[in-house]
Amino acid sequence: MKTILAPVDFSEASINALSFAAEISKRASARLIVINIIQKDGDEEETKNKLKIIESDLKKSIDPDLNCESLIAHGNFVSALKKVIAVQQPDLVVMGTKGASGLKRILIGSNTVNVIAKTSVPVFVIPEAARFESFLYKGKNRIVLATDLEFFENEDALRILKEIASLIIEPKLRVLNVRPANTILPDEKRAEREFLLSFFKQEIESERFTMFSSNVISGINYYLKEKDDTGLVAMIARDSGHLIKKHYSREMASHTHLPLLILHEV
């Protein structure tokens, strides 16, 4: 990763997500861009001062050599962010969600969910209750890649997952597929599963797991409830495909209690 973009609105949720972004930037030697998007009645001078304080605090708490800068944009949140993404070309966007612990829901129309739907950059969604320190705990070292096993050619996105996984102590990856009971996995999906396992297994201990359920989200949530060693969930947001589409990924972002990495097909 070369560039990480972290939108903040100065809420506790966004500042918590920023701590994840800063830790990732430090370990990846990446540039961190902290951005606040001002609505038409916002105070730009006050925002500049707040961003300066945030930059200073990050360098004190994370690393004095942290490559960090701040930006201000104006207008509609998603539209303004898309313009910044087009110019800055970040490899990852890190955003926080409010009230997203314990499977509590947030509004589907939230900024985080809209960014997932309307951009193609990987989005790392951080619930307000999540803490980066959990990545350093071996009891939460499982990464779950939930996938429909349709062909996925965006290896750059998979490399982002691999880099984030490397932050976890002794990480283990599980490729999770949810499908209805009494169904047979087609050969092309078996091949995709083997590709995913081979992509990660040299650096990360990897295995497969199948959950039988007629509803993808219910199946994933049941799995997460039963397997308490999960520290990170990754999903693929697609424009097409039978199982995990963008609206499923948006729904997961609305009630996950774990950090959630959304990877886009293109």
Label each region the model flagged:
Residues 23-28, 135-138, 163-171, 253-256:
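Short, conserved loop/helix-junction motifs that constitute active-site signature segments
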Residues 1-16, 117-157, 254-266:
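Intrinsically disordered or low-complexity boundary/linker segments at protein termini
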Residues 72-80, 212-217:
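Charged docking surfaces used in two-component/phosphorelay signaling
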Residues 67-70:
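Rossmann-fold cofactor-recognition segment
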Residues 184-240:
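Glycine/small-residue-rich hydrophobic helix-like segments
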Residues 23-56, 168-196:
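Acidic, proline/glycine-rich short linear motifs
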Residues 155-165, 196-197:
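Anionic-ligand binding region
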Residues 83-133, 224-266:
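Gly/Ser-rich helix-loop-strand patches that form or flank binding pockets
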